[in-house]
């Protein structure tokens, strides 16, 4: 789950991580009032959307007086920002962060992520702050420094100091930088984050180390023990189909193709998308119905897939392990009748009671094309959608 920058900074502040003072605003008047309350000579007006690249898209402006705050707030609120992370459709700006300006001496990058290859959290840092870390990794990988953290003992002071020295934090500010990184790590672990990214981390003219931006992502599977974080969820920033899917424990991610996919298991879902691409088709979505593919789940999955007007056909690829193929077949038939499906539908079943499942499909009287294998199913649906 993602949260907004201002929310992320509030979380970090509670862990002793230094961030600029700021207030969220939902209207132009609130933005001006927030700037008045901050009482600083310079304010930064920042669009709050769940995407990076806001500055380049015109979503971050420096205001030197209240008139400029009003002008920038009017120009940003309600507009659609298009960045490299939003896609061409962009995201509408519905809230702003009004933040005190600071005298930036140097920008850095600091981030915590899970390294799946080593099964450890890794602290990454670079003195090339303010730019995309992927860009730095591609052009100057030697400027990225990493510390792998033993989960049994957590981030150690010597590791944070080594990072601070490697990215050339001024010696007199190393202590602050170490405290910053230790607090960031505590927040990452205690709040079950999957990403904690500070870009940029800055040193200021008055000798401070602080987070000028903050991106926190949380493990959705752990939200049951973080009610405070769950309350920060902004449904306006999420895809409506993904929200609907989550109500039925379906994992749905929209894509740009025209072949709807309904699969049980994330691995099989990815393999299904791969084989559709292999036969020159384009998947319209990733949709994992999970192990308990009930008739209700299958019906809702069909509805979600069909809400995408680009879908020209559907490929159902189910392995009946926990679920029996005959039960799945009955669910597919019931769902097909309920939604009044008129698009081409190819179904591939394998596993427990597969022959009975195929028999049920064949005797349904519905226009369902049975596939003998995953490859056969992919070829058939690609052919049917033309």
From Swiss-Prot:
Key word ATP-binding present: yes
Signal peptide extent: none
Catalytic activity: succinate + ATP + CoA = succinyl-CoA + ADP + phosphate; GTP + succinate + CoA = succinyl-CoA + GDP + phosphate
E.C. number(s) listed in UniProt: 6.2.1.5
Annotated residues for binding of ATP: 46, 53-55, 99, 102, 107
GO cellular component: cytosol; succinate-CoA ligase complex
Binding-site residues, Mg(2+): 199, 213
Reported cofactor(s): Mg(2+)
Positions bound to substrate: 264, 321-323
Keywords: ATP-binding, Ligase, Magnesium, Metal-binding, Nucleotide-binding, Tricarboxylic acid cycle
Domain ATP-grasp, residue spans: 9-244
Family statement: Belongs to the succinate/malate CoA ligase beta subunit family.
Complex formation: Heterotetramer of two alpha and two beta subunits.
PANTHER family with a match to the protein in the record: SUCCINATE--COA LIGASE [GDP-FORMING] SUBUNIT BETA, MITOCHONDRIAL, SUCCINYL-COA SYNTHETASE BETA CHAIN
Protein name: Succinate--CoA ligase [ADP-forming] subunit beta
Organism: Bacillus thuringiensis (strain Al Hakam)
């Amino acid at each position: 789950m993602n949260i907004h920058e201002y929310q992320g900074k509030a979380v970090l502040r509670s862990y002793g991580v230094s961030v600029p003072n700021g207030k969220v605003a939902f209207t132009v008047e609130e933005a001006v009032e927030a700037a008045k309350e901050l009482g600083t000579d310079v304010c930064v007006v920042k669009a709050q959307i769940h995407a990076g690249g806001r500055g380049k898209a015109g979503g971050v402006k420096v205001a030197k007086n209240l008139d400029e705050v009003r002008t920038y707030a009017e120009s940003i609120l309600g507009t659609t920002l298009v960045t490299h992370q939003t896609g061409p459709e962009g995201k509408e700006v519905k809230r702003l962060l009004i933040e005190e300006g600071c005298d930036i001496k140097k920008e850095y990058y600091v981030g915590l992520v899970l390294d799946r290859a080593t099964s450890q959290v890794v602290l990454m840092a670079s003195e090339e702050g303010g730019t995309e870390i992927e860009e730095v990794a591609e052009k100057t990988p030697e400027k990225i420094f990493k510390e792998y953290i033993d989960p049994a003992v957590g981030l150690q002071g010597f590791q944070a100091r080594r990072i601070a020295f490697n990215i050339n934090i001024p010696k007199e500010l190393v202590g602050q930088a170490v405290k910053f990184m230790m607090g960031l790590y505590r927040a990452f672990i205690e709040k079950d984050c999957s990403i904690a990214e500070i870009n940029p981390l800055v040193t200021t003219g008055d000798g401070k180390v602080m987070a000028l931006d903050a991106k926190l992502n949380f493990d959705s599977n752990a939200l049951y023990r973080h009610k405070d974080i769950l309350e920060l969820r902004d449904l306006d920033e999420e895809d409506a189909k993904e929200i609907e899917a989550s109500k039925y424990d379906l994992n749905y991610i929209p894509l740009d193709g025209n072949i709807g996919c309904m699969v049980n298991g994330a691995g099989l879902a990815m393999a299904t998308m791969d084989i559709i691409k292999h036969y020159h088709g384009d998947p319209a979505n990733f949709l994992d119905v999970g192990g308990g593919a009930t008739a209700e789940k299958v019906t809702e999955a069909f509805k979600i897939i069909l809400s995408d007007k680009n879908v020209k056909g559907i490929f159902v690829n189910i392995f009946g392990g926990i679920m029996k193929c005959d039960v799945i077949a009955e669910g597919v038939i019931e769902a097909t009748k309920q939604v009044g499906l008129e698009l081409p539908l190819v179904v591939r079943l394998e596993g427990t009671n597969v022959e009975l499942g195929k028999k049920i499909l064949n005797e349904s009287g519905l226009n369902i094309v049975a596939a003998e294998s995953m490859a056969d199913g992919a070829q058939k649906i690609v052919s049917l959608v033309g």
